[in-house]
């Protein structure tokens, strides 16, 4: 049961509004045509490798948080600076997801002040789920596993739409598809970096099984979403939100379903970011969650579009590169003092 719970908790962090809207799937996977399978495989391999390697690094360094590993790897001052980067990534991502939930509420709910009310409700709900820890994240992941297949299967059953033109595209090389898949996996793992210490509750063998189960669940959703985008390739060309566009054919019920999927995806990512912020901050968990919620709220005031179109992608890429560095073998001198102090006790 703990393996399934951890796998669902991981799933809740990697599926955000961009995934549920189809934008990320079309950009990183379906756009590669016949090579989309290679992109999916590389993304899953990258996620699995990082999810197994990083907790092992934490155990080897004798620390229980990413900030501690940064200090061991890069020294106190540089470790603190890098931890601030991961804190910024979590707060900005949480703010973007909170803003997305509020915008969805304003679009769906026929009431005044729907934006502000939905933002407040979402932040409170996200804080409660984050306070529950792994069970709260797993509940959000289970909700996504129930909602997304319903949406994707309904979209896949629609007849292929027609377009007035077929976009001219040269065949993609396997290398480009693999690079896109690996980059997607690394970016998502970087956003989950602060929550990955939850895997330390499992022994290495069970940790590997939890990661494999996560890859199976996430891979199935990725494959299903890619099939939808490829099936409707002509109709969704140049569409910023492919699944939202396709849901028009499903009527009001389809529009509500895709909005619910996007809300659940954004909420689950918000919960994961709040958990990560609580782990990054050297404060009691309730205080860390409260400060994390305030940080997400401040960034949400900027608006989803401005956040995504600003330096957010660059920050994500930088944190992904730093995470890869953290997975490199630790020099013996980095953790010998910790082991010596522990043995003296």
Stretches with model-predicted labels:
Residues 5-11, 38-48, 80-91, 98, ...:
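Transmembrane alpha-helical segments of multi-pass small-molecule transport proteins
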